[in-house]
């Protein structure tokens, strides 16, 4: 089975968020399931800048390719590289007009850019002679790929057996643009209606992806259910309910080589479950680095996040002072809304021995927080998958979360009698329940040492591997292929 993963960002070539990590890692693990993966992405400016940093080279292999149907004469070249350490080819679509911005999601016209890329994918595959069984597209930027496949390319013999899987990483971003882009796209006018890509007088690229893909998944089973409700559906819940029988939830994995407490060079001291006392050496060194009193008797609560409402900052702001009045230390890393940046800085001044507010993004400090904290806080309003809780589990740091999306699928409430579970949480999006969950975790840390040790063991034994995820993806590739047979 040949699968082309199509994405705007892929680690290490261009990364803005978690999407890049997913598309950079998944192909490596698909190979273990008799899948032949290739990757297609735009050649953003940042891709060339990252080449030296991540030791990969770019080679131009095709040039001056036209994109029929579109109202443009812009041609594209194709560059090739490989996912580092593998022979998995990455094909980059290069065009100086559309992909000349410094960053991934920038450019003179984001709608035209996404339309151009989506249509160029088909011409690139033909020129390369890459007959793929599955086009695995990601988020709204690639949402028109299945629309082109089922309309303008439906009689093209080259794609007669090709199916599409759409992965929705965050339903909050949909690619909604003025209806005038229909003309540029070359897509048939009949698509501009409520059963097509029309959306409240505009066009919606993600809606096109949902309606025209053979199968759809999102990045956790719980989020797949949530987005079919009015509360989480972002006005697409009706469309998603329509496709309910083709909608799946697959948790992302994490890269076990990259996130490994036994070998991670970014943390102070390496450790394993067998040498868990070395985790506490990390804790003391983090306390020292951040000017907090060095003690193991007080739990360190870590939080690495964008400082926005979605991440639960509104309810946390109501109870943070109550939390700091417990015998705890709180370490924050992140940037975002100015009001929250200032709030954390103000609270740090009030509680200098208990609070360390690091208003920045620092990948090394992030790893140190995952490894050195006792607890990791994620009170999100919604969380499609969430990676923070996975990293913290891997490092034996106990998550305290709101049970939503991927958080509900990865964190299991600790059961004292059965000694099962790997964390603590709350369901109701309310600051009182958040406070209660933190208090419960602090109580276990201070007064139930045997249970705390068991929690760490359960956390570090949780299966968060890409192997598991890749196996699930192969199952739905096959479901899509069976639909077309």
UniProtKB/Swiss-Prot annotation:
GO BP, sorted A to Z: glycogen biosynthetic process
Protein EC: 2.4.1.21
Catalysed reactions, as listed in the record: [(1->4)-alpha-D-glucosyl](n) + ADP-alpha-D-glucose = [(1->4)-alpha-D-glucosyl](n+1) + ADP + H(+)
InterPro entries tied to this protein: Glyco_trans_1 (IPR001296), GS/SS (IPR011835), Starch_synth_cat_dom (IPR013534)
CDD domains listed in its UniProt record: GT5_Glycogen_synthase_DULL1-like
Keyword RNA-binding (UniProt): no
Record keyword Glycosyltransferase present: yes
Pfam families: Glyco_transf_5 (PF08323), Glycos_transf_1 (PF00534)
Catalytic EC class: transferase
Residues engaged in binding ADP-alpha-D-glucose: 15
Keywords in alphabetical order: Glycogen biosynthesis, Glycosyltransferase, Transferase
One example GO MF annotation: alpha-1,4-glucan glucosyltransferase (ADP-glucose donor) activity
Pathway assigned in UniProt: Glycan biosynthesis; glycogen biosynthesis
Family: Belongs to the glycosyltransferase 1 family. Bacterial/plant glycogen synthase subfamily.
Function: Synthesizes alpha-1,4-glucan chains using ADP-glucose.
Protein name: Glycogen synthase
Lineage: Bacteria, Thermotogati, Thermotogota, Thermotogae, Thermotogales
């Amino acid at each position: 089975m040949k699968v082309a993963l199509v994405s705007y960002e892929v680690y290490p070539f261009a990364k803005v968020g978690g999407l890049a990590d997913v598309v950079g890692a998944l192909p490596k693990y698909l190979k273990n399931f008799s899948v032949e993966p290739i990757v297609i992405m735009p050649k953003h400016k940042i891709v060339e800048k990252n080449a030296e940093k991540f030791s990969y080279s770019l080679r131009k292999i095709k040039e001056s390719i036209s994109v029929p149907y579109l109202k443009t004469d812009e041609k594209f070249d194709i560059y090739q590289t490989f996912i580092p350490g593998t022979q998995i080819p990455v094909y980059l679509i290069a065009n100086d007009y559309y992909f000349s911005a410094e960053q991934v999601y920038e450019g003179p016209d984001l709608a035209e850019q996404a339309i151009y890329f989506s249509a160029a994918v088909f011409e690139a595959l033909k020129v390369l002679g890459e007959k793929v069984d599955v086009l695995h597209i990601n988020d709204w930027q690639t949402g028109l790929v299945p629309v082109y496949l089922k309309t303008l390319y439906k009689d093209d013999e080259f794609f007669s057996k090709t199916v599409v899987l759409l992965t929705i990483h965050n339903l909050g971003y949909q690619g909604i643009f003025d209806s005038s882009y229909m003309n540029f796209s070359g897509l048939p006018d009949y698509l501009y209606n409520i059963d097509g890509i029309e959306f409240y007088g505009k066009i919606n690229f993600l809606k096109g992806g949902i309606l025209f893909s053979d199968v759809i998944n999102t990045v956790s089973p719980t989020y797949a259910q949530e987005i079919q409700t009015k509360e989480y559906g972002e006005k697409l819940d009706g469309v998603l309910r329509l496709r309910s029988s083709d909608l799946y939830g697959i948790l992302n994995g994490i890269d076990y080589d990259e996130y490994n407490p036994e070998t991670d060079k970014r943390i102070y001291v390496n450790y394993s479950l067998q040498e868990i006392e070395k985790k506490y050496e990390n804790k003391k060194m983090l306390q020292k680095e951040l000017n907090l009193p060095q003690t193991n008797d007080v739990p360190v609560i870590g939080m690495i996040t964008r400082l926005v409402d979605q991440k639960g900052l509104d309810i946390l702001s109501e109870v943070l002072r109550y939390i700091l009045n417990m015998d705890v230390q709180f370490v924050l890393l992140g940037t975002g809304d100015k009001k929250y940046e200032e709030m954390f800085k103000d609270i740090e001044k009030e509680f200098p021995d208990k609070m360390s507010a690091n208003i920045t993004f620092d990948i090394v400090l992030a790893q140190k927080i995952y490894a050195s904290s006792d607890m990791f806080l994620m009170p999100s309003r919604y969380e499609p998958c969430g990676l923070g809780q996975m990293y913290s589990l891997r490092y034996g740091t106990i998550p305290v979360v709101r049970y939503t999306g991927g958080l509900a699928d990865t964190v299991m409430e600790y059961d004292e009698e059965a000694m099962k579970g790997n964390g603590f949480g709350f369901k109701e999006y309310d600051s009182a329940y958040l406070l209660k969950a933190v208090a419960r975790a602090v109580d276990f840390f201070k007064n139930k040492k045997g249970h705390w040790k068991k929690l760490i063991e359960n956390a570090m034994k949780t299966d968060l591997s890409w192997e598991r995820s890749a196996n699930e993806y192969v199952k739905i590739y096959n479901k899509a292929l069976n639909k077309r047979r």
